[in-house]
Regions:
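Inter-lobe coupling linker of SF2 helicases/translocases
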Residues: 1-9, 40-73, 81-212
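SF2 helicase catalytic motif II
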Residues: 4-49
């Protein structure tokens, strides 16, 4: 077992690869909260919890340039890895408690995945009490910004990005229509998620935009 190996400390580079940890919550049908996660992330959580217990909260070092990139839940996951005991001292024993203190669910009209219409969508996407949250996180985080590192980055021609618009050709229009049909099937529950899903459609749509 891991305990029998005698490991008393771990250093994890590219720690963002372990952000996909399953979140258990009473909030239903809210985007940004995933109840499914990767096995490697669950394994990492168990190792971090064990090392934290035998080292009084020490012995774990994460290094990453993107601790948060997709959802607010990734902040909770990082804190769960690195400062679970500190959260529990504040009475935060689970995600819903953390979310009640530091997050908010918003509902807005959004374009559907396939781009054929609009629908109301609830998302966990707004921080509250952000200064307090950052003060807690900085107890374990040494944050280095690009300005602090003084990285040698080449200047962007023109000083800002240039948006190039193009009209869709017949092929792009045909694929977009196919996205609509696929999305309707997925929404109706007539497709196995392992065969087709909204994430797959979104990914293919991004590739289509690049190809256009």
């Amino acid at each position: 077992t891991f305990e029998e190996l005698g490991v008393d400390s771990i250093m994890v580079d590219e720690a963002h690869n372990f952000k996909n940890l399953a979140i258990f919550s009473k909030m239903n049908n809210v985007s940004g909260i995933s109840s499914s996660g990767a096995k490697k992330s669950t394994d990492m959580q168990l190792k971090c919890q064990y090392l934290s217990e035998i080292n009084d909260g020490r012995g774990i070092v994460f290094a990453t340039g993107t601790p948060i990139s997709n959802t607010m839940c990734e902040m909770y996951v990082m804190q769960l890895y690195l400062q679970k005991a500190a959260l529990e001292e504040m009475g935060i024993y689970h995600f819903d408690s953390w979310a009640a203190n530091f997050g908010e669910v918003t509902t807005a009209l959004e374009l559907t995945v396939e781009g054929s219409g609009f629908r109301f969508k609830s998302r966990f996407n707004k921080f509250t009490n952000l200064p307090e949250l950052m003060n807690i996180f900085r107890e374990v985080a040494d944050v280095q910004t690009a300005d602090m590192l003084d990285l040698d980055v080449p200047a962007l021609r023109g000083g800002k990005p240039i948006i190039v618009e193009s009209e869709p050709d017949w092929y792009v229009k045909q694929v977009m229509e196919d996205f609509v049909v696929r999305a309707e099937r997925i929404r109706g529950g007539g497709v196995d998620p392992s065969v087709d899903n909204f994430l797959k459609i979104t990914h293919e749509a991004r590739l289509l935009g690049t190809d256009a």
